[in-house]
Amino acid sequence: MRFIAAVLVLLFQIENLPPPYPRDGTTKLLENDRVIVWDVSWLQQAYPVHRHVYDYAGVYYTNGDRIIVSERGARSRTTSVAWDTFFFRRGVTHSEEGASDDPLRGVFLEFKEPAALGVVDTETTTPAFAGTAGRNVRESERVVIWEFVPAPDTASSPHRHTRDAVVVAFTKLKPRVSFVPHGTVHADEQTAGADRAYVFELK
């Protein structure tokens, strides 16, 4: 009975952990029915234990260190590098501390749906967006991430977005975010003048 009670208490604690955001050092950049996009900085402070309730992906845009504390209290110092991308499944539970004089920074996308929707526009009158001039840097069951260095300009050819997409453009390490619904036809990603851009195609 004591064991069962202890398990129930643990499950209750896990279910009642706060989400990772909002918190000090974060700014919400965009939210709609599909995603929440955050600009995240790891300040030199200890953050509460939290649980990632959504699958999430993103890109770091500065170098930086942080200390990750596991559920069991194990501490590990990690270094992240600017322009590395990532994808993690929901359920990650930990706490974090910024460990750099210049904070690690990144743009995080949280996917609200528990699984990919699989919505794809099949219209063929306009060529589909295929990351032309970009590089496919990561793909998972939830997202395809394209990197453009430099960012696409307004001289690009017209194309159709077959999937919903989040465009993140960086100018002097300042992110700008926009959402492009599937079926959109245009000639550019509104990233002219940016140093680089990332297109996150949502599956």
Q: Which residues does each predicted region cover?
A:
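Jelly-roll (double-stranded beta-helix
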Residues: 3, 13-203
